[in-house]
Each structure stands twice: as structure tokens, then as C-alpha cells.
């Protein structure tokens, strides 16, 4: 006898745990150009990794509209990707990512149809990579330093708050060119 998965849909239209209902995937360019990419996506991968502090992913698409030209999409941290989704257990979630690279670009026909992959990550990852801290921290706990570093160097407007487990002992350390996340480790 085969176990059958329940087929009743919840309010989000998903059937099984692990199902994801993608709402919108909107490209926002620096010049104000916006486009919903949902209908031209071939594959979307969003990765959370226990060895990485930041979410990252790739979006492969077949572009019949010439978005690389009209956006333009440079992949140098100038464009944003807004992803909205639902799961069986959550209300709608909207995540903002920064596109840092365009790869695997290939022309599919003589017109403007192209296939390519957009590589993206969180805005905090870009800020972390761009900054080095040369500073001595004294008179606080490690959890207080983590909150301070997040607020001063990584926090983005509308971004998530940092959840930190309180620590007990007052300590000091010196950052000699570490990134903000290296200081928070």
C-alpha cells in the first residue's frame, strides 16, 4: 500500500511541507526600471548555508525583452531583486537581494532572446565585503560588540534585526582590518 500525501491546499495554495508559492520576483535597476521576472524564470536557487552568514542565490532566465540593455543589468551591486514567497507555515515573506554578477550569457536566436544567470546575495554581504575595520573595542561583552558592529557597519534600512544571545563577561579585542562579520564571529 502506498502512502499518499494529503492533497488539501492551505490558504497559500501549497500542498506539502517544503512547497513554496513564489509570489513576485521583481528586478529593480538603479535608473528606476522595474520588471517582474516571474514568467521568464527557468530556475531559482536561494541558499542558506551554516558556514556562511549570508543568503545567496542564482536566478536563471530566458530574456525575450532585452532586460540587460534596458535595465541595464550590470551585475555590479547596482540592481536589486525583490523576491516574495509563501510557505505552508508562514505569512508572505519579501526578501531583498543585490545582483553582483551576470554569468552564463548566451544568445538563443537572432532577435533579442538571451539566456543568462543573475547571481545575488543579501545587501549585508555586499557591505561586509566592502568594509574593513581598524579599531579596538573595549568595555563591553561580545554580544554588545556584535550588536554595535551590526548597527554601525552592516545594518541596512528595512533589513532584519540581529538576534544575539547575551554573553556575560566584559572583554576587549582589536580588529586589524577584519570585515564586520569577521569581528562578530
Language-model features: where?
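Assembly/oligomerization scaffold segments
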Residues: 1-127
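Charged- and aromatic-enriched interaction segments used to assemble
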Residues: 110-185
Amino acid at each position: 500500500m502506498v502512502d499518499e500525501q494529503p492533497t488539501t491546499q492551505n490558504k497559500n495554495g501549497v500542498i506539502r511541507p517544503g512547497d513554496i508559492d513564489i509570489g513576485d520576483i521583481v528586478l529593480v535597476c538603479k535608473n528606476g526600471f522595474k520588471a517582474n521576472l516571474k514568467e521568464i524564470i527557468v530556475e531559482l536557487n536561494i541558499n542558506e548555508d551554516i558556514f556562511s552568514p549570508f543568503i545567496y542565490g542564482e536566478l536563471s532566465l530566458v530574456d525575450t525583452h532585452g532586460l540587460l540593455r534596458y535595465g541595464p543589468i550590470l551585475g555590479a551591486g547596482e540592481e536589486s531583486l525583490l523576491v516574495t514567497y509563501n510557505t505552508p507555515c508562514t505569512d508572505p515573506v519579501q526578501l531583498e537581494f543585490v545582483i553582483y554578477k551576470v554569468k552564463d550569457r548566451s544568445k538563443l536566436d537572432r532577435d533579442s532572446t538571451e539566456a543568462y544567470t543573475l547571481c545575488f546575495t543579501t545587501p549585508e554581504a555586499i557591505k561586509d565585503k566592502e568594509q574593513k575595520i581598524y579599531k579596538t573595542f573595549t568595555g563591553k561583552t561580545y554580544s554588545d560588540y556584535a550588536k554595535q558592529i551590526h548597527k554601525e557597519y552592516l545594518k541596512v534600512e528595512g533589513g532584519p534585526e540581529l538576534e544575539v544571545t547575551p554573553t556575560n563577561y566584559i572583554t576587549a579585542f582589536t580588529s586589524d582590518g577584519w570585515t564586520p562579520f569577521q569581528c562578530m564571529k
